Structures are given as C-alpha cells and as structure tokens.
Amino acid sequence: LLLKGYRPEESGLQGEVNAGYLYNYRSGTQGGISLLYTTPKWNIDLLYNTHYEQNRQTTDTYSHHTLKNNIYDICQHNDIDRKGITHYVRTGAEYKFNDNAHINLAYTGVFNPNNDNHSYSDGNITTADNRTKKEARMHNIALDYLSGFGMKAGINYTSYHSESHQQFTNKDNKNQTSEFHTTSGQTIDHWKIYVDQSHTL
C-alpha cells in the first residue's frame, strides 16, 4: 500500500505498508511500515519492520564404525528447532537552513527479544538435549551538521547488549548423565565525535 506522493517543493505525507507470509517447515510472518513527511524546511521519516520465523531441521544418521576389530552400529535421530523475532526501527529528522546547510538527527534500533534454539538427539549411543535462549538489542543515535561554509560536525553513539542462556543434558548408553548450564553476554558502548572543515581553492 503506497500513500500519496508529493513533489519535492510540496509539503505532505507519503508512506508504504507491507506484509508477508513465509512458508518453510513451519510458518513465519513479516511486515512493516514506512512514513515520510516533508515540508520545504523539514524531512521527517519513520521506518518499522518486523520478522518472525520458526523452522525445523531433521536428520537421521546410520553408520558402522570399526574399533579394535569390532564393528559398532550407530543410529541417531536429530531434531533442531529454531524460532525468533526481530524488530527494526528507524526514525530521523532533517532541518534545512538553506540549500547548503542542514542538520540531521536519526535513531536506529534493532531488537531480538526472544530467540529460542532447541536441539534433541536420540539413539543407541547417546541422548542429548540442548536448549538456548538468546536476546539482543542495539541502539544508535546520530547527529550530523553541515554548514554553508564547508564545516561538517557530528556525534554518533551506539549501544549494544546481548545475553545467552544454555542448558545442556547428555545421557550415554550406560545411563550416565551429564548436565551443564551456561550464561554469557556482551555489552558495548561506543562514541564517535567528529569535526571536519574543507575549503574550495
């Protein structure tokens, strides 16, 4: 769906809405909206997209291994399930002082609030169950200025955080069980400030 468009010298709102259906072993959806409002002095935009998907991978393994003149038959069935959702957001505003000078402010965010992975393996050698939950988010804010006399200046800040939790259980053919839990994460904060001056000779 596309809203009304406008010529560059006009003021008005234009935009687009989209949606989709993904078919794999399991289904998923995606969709989004984009809007742009313009005046002779201002450009303001908004973009949002989301994507949800789930799928399964299945494998069966049959093999014969020889160890010390003995032949061992190995049969394993493996299932891997994945599902997760991603949100993407961007909004920005530009103000034009004149044809040669403007200032821009933009925000970008990416969010993965819940991504689940589950793998299960069962056979005559071992039975294993592995579950992982992950989440991540990223924020970026950028302010840029261009003067009419060749100076560029700006500030850019990025924040990123992720977490992962894993639970693993394994039982061998002698009924001996091992289990562990892990938690990991990462946090990044990054600043960038710049000033540049150029002259035309």
Residue ranges and their predicted role:
Residues 118, 165-166:
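Extended amphipathic alpha-helical scaffold segments
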Residues 122:
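Short, conserved phosphate-binding/catalytic loop or strand-edge motifs used
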